[in-house]
């Protein structure tokens, strides 16, 4: 059995803190020489304990959820309209309905059919699994989300004929709709694929909010991208 070379932390617990029950496992991995790829809100590479331990054992720390640098931040200007590639955005009726998985599956299927496809991630897990470009949008100041997404789409479109973009949350979600709208306006897609869980009534982690359904979501998508 080959030895592991990296530990990937693909879970971001509510509140963003590092659970105490995980610390020993992460320490053991570093002592074994494993790099750590983390999607946590807490940046291991900026904490003395983890930096010191990694240096002692020749391991590297990768904090995927870091904010873009200042030179990557700009307001959207519509330049994505000039790309030659077809852009497909995956949206949903709620959080955690399969937008990222659908985006990745569409990308793989397009490649299998011989299409020149690339994809853009908007969350840490998509970046970890190999998107051509990506950003963790919840780390981007609100004014700049559309511009950052626009740049990522344009970059991938320069090298590919078809670009798939991972969406976040939903336009009808009272907590996160602003992020969804910024991604929609930044990607300005030629087509949208809508993910839905038909039996879901209450929103994930927001049970007082109800899922509004496919028809309302589609109307908003069409109205806001016309």
Regions found by a protein language model. Give the residues of each.
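N-terminal Rossmann-like NAD(P) cofactor-binding subdomain of oxidoreductases
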Residues: 1-86, 91-92
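Short coil/turn connectors at secondary-structure junctions
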Residues: 2-5, 32, 56-59, 83-86, ...
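Fold-independent oxyanion-binding glycine-rich loops
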Residues: 10-12, 39-41, 64-66, 91-94, ...
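Short glycine/serine/threonine-rich phosphate/pyrophosphate-binding segments
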Residues: 17-19, 96-104, 128-129, 171-176
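Generic hydrophobic/aromatic pocket-lining and core-packing "Φ" positions
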Residues: 22-26, 107, 180-181, 218
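Conserved catalytic-core segment of NTP-binding enzymes
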Residues: 42-44, 48-52, 63-71, 76-78, ...
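Walker A (P-loop) phosphate-binding motif
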Residues: 74-119
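N-terminal phosphate/diphosphate-binding loop that engages ATP/GTP or pyrophosphate donors
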Residues: 107-143
């Amino acid at each position: 059995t080959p030895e592991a070379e990296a530990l990937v932390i693909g879970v971001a617990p509510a509140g963003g803190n590092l659970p105490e029950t995980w610390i020993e496992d992460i320490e053991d991995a570093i002592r074994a020489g494993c790099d750590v790829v983390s999607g946590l809100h807490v940046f291991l590479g900026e904490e003395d304990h983890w930096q010191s331990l990694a240096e002692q054992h020749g391991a590297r720390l990768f904090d995927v959820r870091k904010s873009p640098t200042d030179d990557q931040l700009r307001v959207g200007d519509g330049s994505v309209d000039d790309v030659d590639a077809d852009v497909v955005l995956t949206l949903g009726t709620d959080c955690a309905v399969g937008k990222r998985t659908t985006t990745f599956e569409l990308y793989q299927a397009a490649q299998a059919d011989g299409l020149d496809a690339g994809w853009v991630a908007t969350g840490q897990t998509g970046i970890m699994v190999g998107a051509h470009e990506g950003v963790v949008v919840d780390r981007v100041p609100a004014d700049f989300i559309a511009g950052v997404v626009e740049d990522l789409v344009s970059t991938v479109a320069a090298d590919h004929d078809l670009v798939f973009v991972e969406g976040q949350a939903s336009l009808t979600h009272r907590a996160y709709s602003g992020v969804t709208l910024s991604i929609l306006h930044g990607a300005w897609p030629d087509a949208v694929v809508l993910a839905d869980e038909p039996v879901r009534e209450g929103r994930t982690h927001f049970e007082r909010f109800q899922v509004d359904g496919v028809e309302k979501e589609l109307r908003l998508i069409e109205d806001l991208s016309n």
